[in-house]
Amino acid sequence: LGAVHGIASVIGGMYPAPHGEVCASLLTAVMRANISALMSRTPESRVIQRYERIAHLVTGNSKASFSDGIEWFIKLCQDLEIPRLKRLGVKKDEFPQIVISSKLSSSIKSNPIELTDSELLEILETAY
């Protein structure tokens, strides 16, 4: 389930925000953070190739990069009017607690790479 669900479950426990909307609002920020962390810490990871394969599938372009895939998902979220965390009522001053609690969630343990506190905070900032 990974970081999307790990963070979303914490937010859902703190705010009356629909789980699916929280997950969707976090998706592209988590994708970016995962790819960045993988490229810098484990560039040989096959997960990077999986992100590229997803980009090929969603864009219909066999030469699409993982960045193209992320842009496709960003556009989809805009088209579907997925709310940002701010619109879902999440308070920025609670980001540190969300990070701490997210690291304890069982879902985050299945993320393809362990994310640092600063990476988790950046996800929240990006999705805000």
Per-range role (PLM):
Residues 1-23, 105-109:
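Glycine-rich phosphate/pyrophosphate-binding beta-alpha loops
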